[in-house]
Amino acid sequence: VSVVLGIDTAGPVVGAALVGPGLERVWSERVVRGADAVLIPAIAELLEGAPQLDAVAVTIGPGAFTSLRVGVATALGFAMSHGVDVVCISSLEARASMVSGQRVLALLDARKSRVYAQTFDTLTGSTLSEAVDAALETVLPMSPFVAVGEGVKLGETLIADAGGTVAVDPGRSPALAVAKLGLQRRTDAVPPSAVALAYLRDADAQKLAERR
């Protein structure tokens, strides 16, 4: 029986969720800058009166460089203060796991008309393609498929023309999915010191792209 805190800051909507037996608390907010200013107090409120925390799950990338760092730093801070380990989750898998389907395309905006993309079979929990940083038209899977994640907004017409459907609001935070994946993967938890971000793009190039 475990209580897991999930955190996602890979996109413009940052979120956190707490799950456990008979427990499900979720918070999210669209943030332009300074995610830590709203994220940390929101998590403190989620944890108020909750049972003891057993693990923290956090998305480690790909995604917005600065925002990802805030999320991971926050996760490490809470993990260390509670003396628990961290479950590292792909930000693309977290978004895909919000829907059920044989072909689920998870998309995040990578700036400069590109997306971070990966296709999953969420019915079997398998990965159908590698995570890539590419133009949207090059990553569309065979029809039919479901598209999810903030990157959907870059090409809803393109997705529809390729036989894809959009299952959930592209701006919806996957924080609850992150917490649930963390619960399933408690045995994969690592000490805070072993957590590393997973960029698909060179960090300096990514920071430059985000400034444009």
Regions found by a protein language model. Name each.
Residues 22-34, 38, 84-174, 188-189, ...:
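Surface "functional belts" at beta-alpha junctions
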Residues 1-65:
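N-terminal beta-alpha supersecondary unit
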Residues 48-53, 79-89:
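Phosphate-handling active-site elements
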Residues 36-40, 75, 175-179:
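A general structural signal for well-ordered alpha-helical segments in protein cores
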Residues 47, 179-190:
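Short, hydrophobic alpha-helical segments
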